[in-house]
Design a protein with these regions (language model features):
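Small-aliphatic-rich amphipathic alpha-helix that forms the alpha element of a beta-alpha
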Residues: 19, 42-43, 88, 97-118
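N-terminal amphipathic, basic helical "cap/leader" segment at the start of enzyme domains
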Residues: 1-87, 97
Length: 118
């Protein structure tokens, strides 16, 4: 939590004021079942045309891709992420073929849609 009081300029739900980004993790492992449950919930997020342009790549600490994914992060993020039980990378498809379209075109909304999934 922030040491500085957070005060909204206008009336909003307290959950927005009290939100925080964790950067400290325990060494407790996360089970495959729990991790896949989180990813399943994300899979159901809304997207334009119900296209779900995102894909998740994940590695738990005890898996071969752990170091590979950790090394993709910038040094600052690597410093705190190395304590996490799992790393999840989110990628998104940048093109889209509308229903009935013969060719794909840029999916200008892919980052917005992908953001709704995490």
């Amino acid at each position: 939590m922030s040491a500085t009081p957070r005060i909204a300029d206008y009336a909003i739900n307290e959950q927005f004021i009290n939100r925080w980004s964790p950067r400290a993790f325990t060494a407790e492992p996360i089970s495959e079942e729990t991790l896949l449950s989180f990813l399943e919930a994300a899979r159901w997020a809304p997207s334009a045309y119900n296209s779900q342009p995102w894909r998740f790549l994940y590695a738990r600490r005890d898996t071969p891709n752990w170091e590979r994914y950790l090394n993709l992060l910038v040094p600052f993020n690597r410093s705190w992420a190395q304590q996490a039980s799992a790393l999840v990378l989110i990628i998104s498809k940048t093109t889209f073929a509308a229903p009935g379209a013969a060719e794909e075109s840029p999916a200008l909304w892919h980052t917005f849609d992908t953001g709704s999934a995490w």
